[in-house]
């Protein structure tokens, strides 16, 4: 039986520059592969090589045996879905944080959106949409508004948008990024069911710290665009078990004793309703100096909406009972939005999606002193702060590179650094380590554990317990818009 894809000592070129040199790889019909590697290892590029996005040399060394004698083109038969890239990650839905910026007139249903994604004969469009929705357990949500989909449902909607094309091979780049435990389990079950029926065949990319799904049979490991292992999953020694020459201090087992100081943010009886749906319900929360909060909750629970209030970036802010740094928001004796944001460092998937990728890494850090993404004046104080961060996280070699030229994971890490560089009174980290290598996560933990001052506070969101730094000394959980603060 013909294999799906075959490289035989192939060099892949992009504008005559080699991406991978002399690689050999074969995807057999009964195999499901995981491409594993650190940020910048070439995972996404390798998936695009499989898709046929780059020039193979020699041309005869690369083939799609499963298409031999068929009229299907590779671009029809092979679909690539990049969950971590800017823009695409939010393509299927509107983020909670921006719900209230949207007008119902611009909303659409899931069914209409999937019909719009279909590229085949219109006569079969409805049938293909129904089948794709069934495969992703979304049939009951077809009449629903995209706005009301949770993160996990939206991820499945993105998957359905590719399945409507009926691909024979589906390439998924970091499909589990940003999903809570339940959503990861549901998605894994769906992908496993598809793989059992070989409809479609699945290849996905993962970080070294990600759990390899049960349905995966083979692993290909990449390091610096070179294959370091390919073969059965059972024989694979995970990259995280390899020895490393990178000195990384272990996380502190206990957080430093810190005196809890005065309130920085305080909210009372906060409610938020979008078109009849109560997103936040009677929230009472105070964030004080010295506190290191972990805010948890499932996808769609209201976390991001709550943080939009915390950072002063919600359009209903003026109608809410919130004090920032001891002052109410508003004219006169109140505090302005600009004053609020000047005292807060913030990173999130939304900021990453909207951040200008033409900025260099240095310029991205400098923009921390701007209330927008523009580049403010460079002063000696700012230069010293940026230089310290570049030194702290070993980023000097990339400081002059545009964000567009580095991996998505490194882009997100630069924006984490942007959130801390000016030592703001409040650091707000919404999924800061999505797609970030373990090395940099450890370095970030060491900084947060040891170098946040007693007068600073922190709030961090993550769906992975091991992405929370040891300095966390307060926890809150949000469920269906209700906040529970743990002792």
Swiss-Prot record:
The keyword Repressor does not apply. Its main location: mitochondrion. GO terms for cellular component: mitochondrion. It comes from the Eukaryota. The keyword Metal-binding does not apply. Keywords: ATP-binding, Mitochondrion, Nucleotide-binding, Repeat. Pfam families: ABC_tran (PF00005). It is found in: Mitochondrion. GO terms for molecular function: ATP binding; ATP hydrolysis activity. Residues 5-249, 265-487 form the ABC transporter domain. ATP binds at residues 297-304. InterPro entries: AAA+_ATPase (IPR003593), ABC_transporter-like_ATP-bd (IPR003439), Molybdenum_import_ModC (IPR050334), P-loop_NTPase (IPR027417). Belongs to the ABC transporter superfamily. This is Uncharacterized ABC transporter ATP-binding protein C323.04. It comes from Schizosaccharomyces pombe (strain 972 / ATCC 24843) (Fission yeast).
